[in-house]
UniProtKB/Swiss-Prot annotation:
<comment type="function">
    <text>Probable component of the endoplasmic reticulum-associated degradation (ERAD) pathway.</text>
</comment>
<comment type="similarity">
    <text>Belongs to the LCL2 family.</text>
</comment>
<dbReference type="InterPro" id="IPR034543">
    <property type="entry name" value="LCL2"/>
</dbReference>
<keyword id="KW-0732">Signal</keyword>
<dbReference type="GO" id="GO:0036503">
    <property type="term" value="P:ERAD pathway"/>
</dbReference>
<protein>
    <recommendedName>
        <fullName>Long chronological lifespan protein 2</fullName>
    </recommendedName>
</protein>
<feature type="signal peptide">
    <location>
        <begin position="1"/>
        <end position="20"/>
    </location>
</feature>
Amino acid sequence: MRFFASLPLVILALISSAQAQFGFFDQMFGGQQQQQQQPQNVPSDPSQYQQRYDGSYCENYLCPDTLACVHFPHHCPCPWPANQDKFELTEGSSRICVSKGGFAAGEAARKVELARKGLL
């Protein structure tokens, strides 16, 4: 009779042991995979930029694309200086930033000069 009284305890112990082992294997080999959240795209809402622009203090000229404070607009740096070359369109006027990608040294400057003359 004692055997039948302890039988449910033995069965319960075996079941919990088996669940623990299978839980380990499930986790180890990808069972019950947890959903990973994908990063969200940045919204196309300019309000964040507008807040930073409005909150920037500059006594001279605030560059609109880099928010750098400079004395004159043509002193504005390029947003990506490692990937862009800066050119002034005319002496003391606005500047443009041209991608360095794929051009030989000086090639971007030559193309800007040809475009300025209307030859490109």
